[in-house]
Structure formats: structure tokens, C-alpha cells
Amino acid sequence: MRSLSSVALLSAIGAASAQAGPWGQCAGISHTGPTTCESGWSCVYLNDWYSQCQPGAATSSSTTVSSTKQPSSTVAAPSSTTSAHTLPTGSGSFAKTDGLKFNIDGKTKYFAGTNAYWLPFLTNNADVDAVFDHLQQTGLKILRTWGFNDVNTIPGSGTVYFQLHDKATGTSTINTGANGLQRLDYVISAAEKHGIKLIIPFVNNWDDYGGMNAYINAYGGSKTEWYTNEKIQSVYQAYIKAIVSRYRDSPAIFAWELGNEPRCKGCSTDVIYNWVAKTSAYIKSLDPNHMVTTGEEGMGLTVDSDGSYPYSKDEGSDFARNLAAPDIDFGVYHLYVADWGVSDNAWGNRWIKSHAKVCEAAGKPCLFEEYGIKDDHCGDSLKWQKTSLTTTANSADLFWQYGQQLSTGASPNDHYTIYYGTDDWKCAVIDHISQI
């Protein structure tokens, strides 16, 4: 789903220090920041644009990268983390597949969850904690939230962003500061404390929070070339490596997701498939313990196809083929009947069952990752929940989207939003969970 509202709240930018703090940037061509790490942290070469302070065997109070490992381009952290900052350090088991179902915390069953794309962009920790309190109390186990926030120019003071793609220099900057990945750090730490599992996508197909066009604006190419442009894919993989390296030991991660609703209109399905296969293999090379999925809408199906637009391959996607990629652990699909030009409950049920058949044939579970109807939260979508719950291989559903009253007012309302504690919350969430 396109995240239609921006939540850009203020937070203090961490001050630069003589040494890079935990997970800070410590080397890179044209890098003018710290080149040593705090005690107990080593400067680790990640790619041609970025070296990062990671936990490791520093033998003295600082560690310096050899000149032979200086990257050939720049990715600098505009504000380094400080020694007072706490990174996620939770313990527990990793979520995994178990046949056609998911296993979380040793339990193999059907799970319910939701989406709250805006959560890492909040700067009030109490607001983040309140969200997780309510998810935990309700019994929602999986939360999908954005792991990206791409910009082409540095925003106003304190505005949260994760990565700068500089149009003038053609270089990328990962923001590990207090208005950057430290916000995602807090979300993951809070998820650990509350026993909630997170799905983290790395890029957006849509322009909200930068998306693929933020890359294109800085490095050239077009939307259909994004998946094959060498410069873009190198920067994209550098970002993946920074994120996965930062959180790969956290049990709060349910799955890494290649992107939100990737499309390549008019392209051969080879384009997205090859990207899926290559990127998922790369993620598994960094982190073999967490699951990986595509983030796609589920378009491009021959099973039970009625010839409608979502079943077609017009957007360059082949659901069954993408699911079959060796390093994809489970399938995901979305459902928005009005946006896609289909309008009844029966079509939605058909869509759910079609994907379940493909997942069952592949021997992998399906996750009904986004669904909803504008301003009608207790109608057809409840029937879709029941269909998902009772169809083999459908093993979890996440409604779009969660809403809550925050210290700054209500969270974004795109008319799909279901606010905690309302009558709609009871019929669409509480009653659904009671049936699992």
C-alpha cells in the first residue's frame, strides 16, 4: 500500500565525536568523519561505499581501517551514535517456517498482525512503547513497518530519515544518528521487549518516503531500469548490508523484505525474478537465520485466473515463479479491490485461495500481508479474514493499517486505518483473534 501521509517528527541530531560510535561510519573515499571506533568495536569494511563500527575484537581503545580498504565512494553517517545509545540486544528464538505454517516462540499456528509503516519515524519513545503495549495486549504478533526512509536532500533539523542519495555528488549517506537509524533501533528494542515480530522492507516502489525514485534521482536510469542498474543495485545492497548487519542477531525480526510492492510495468517477468533471486541470496549470505520474502502484491497468477488486471503479468510480476526462488521462505500478497478495479467479496476470496494453492504447491506458507476496505472495516474484509484463516497454506494475515492516538495527535489516517480501542477495532481485530 502507498503510505499516503508523511510523519516527519523532530529529534535532536547526535553530535559528531572524535571516534565513531557503535554502528557509526568509519571509512570511505571523501569521508571526513571519524576513522576510529570506540573500545570494543572494530571498523569493518562492508562495501565500496561504507565501512562501519561493529562489535568485535578491537585490541585497543580504537581501531583504524587499513588504507587498502578505503572505499571508492562515500557513505557517511551525518551524526554518529554515542556511547549512551543502546542497540537491540534481545535473546530468544528466531521465527521460522514449519511446513505450511509459521513457528514463533516455539508455537506453530496461525498468527494475526498489522502494518504501521510510520512507527520508526516517531521521536517520542513513549508513543512507540504504547503501540507495542497495545499490540501485545491484543494478541497481534507480527508488525510490518518501514525499514527505509530515503531522501535526496537533507531535511529540516531533527526530521527522521535513514538514507541520503545526493544528486549533486551521486553518493549515498546512511544516517546512523539520533534522527536516523537510532529510531529504528528503538522500535526493534521495543519489539523485543514485547515479544512482537517485525517484517522490515528495504525500499519502496512508491515515492512515499523516497522510494526507488530517490535512487533514480541521484544515480540516473528509470523505474523499469531500477532492478538492473548496477550503481543503484550496489547502493541498495550496501543499505541492506548495513541494516542486516545491525539487527541480524535480534529475535524481533520476523523477516527481511526486499521491498514494498515491487513493480516493473511492461517488463519481462525475468527482471523482477532475477532481482528477487539475487537479492534474497545476498541477504541469506549475510543472515542465514532470518526469513526472507519479496513484499510483492501477488500479481501475475495463472491459478484460478479470471483474466482481471491483478491476475495479469502487466506489472512484471510472476507470483509463483518469485515464490520458487530458492532463498524466498514464504509468499506474501495484498488485496485492495477498489484500487484494482474489482469490487466484491467473492473476488477477494478467490484471490486469497488462488495464492494459497500456489503456496501449497511450492511447500511454503503464504502470508496475507496487506488488506482493507476504505471506511468499511467490518464488512467484506471480515469475510476475507475467515477465508484466510480456514484455507490451507494461508498462515498469517496483517491488516492495513494500525492506528493510535499519539502525543502529537492521531497516527496517519488513510481511511483504511483501524484505531485501537474503537468499535471497528473490536469487530475487525478482537473478534478475529478470538477465532484463531
Swiss-Prot record:
Enzyme class: hydrolase
Signal peptide: 1-18
Top-level taxon: Eukaryota
Reactions mediated catalytically: Random hydrolysis of (1->4)-beta-D-mannosidic linkages in mannans, galactomannans and glucomannans
Molecular functions per Gene Ontology: cellulose binding; mannan endo-1,4-beta-mannosidase activity
One of the GO biological process terms: mannan catabolic process
Active site (record annotation): 261, 370
GO cellular component terms given for this protein: extracellular region
Spans annotated as Disordered: 60-88
Start and end residues of each CBM1 domain: 19-54
Localization: Secreted
Region annotated Ser-rich linker, chain positions: 79-113
Chain spans, region Catalytic: 114-436
Family: Belongs to the glycosyl hydrolase 5 (cellulase A) family.
Domain comment, as recorded: Has a modular structure: a carbohydrate-binding module (CBM) at the N-terminus, a linker rich in serines, and a C-terminal endo-1,4-mannanase catalytic module. The genes for catalytic modules and CBMs seem to have evolved separately and have been linked by gene fusion.
Protein name: Mannan endo-1,4-beta-mannosidase F
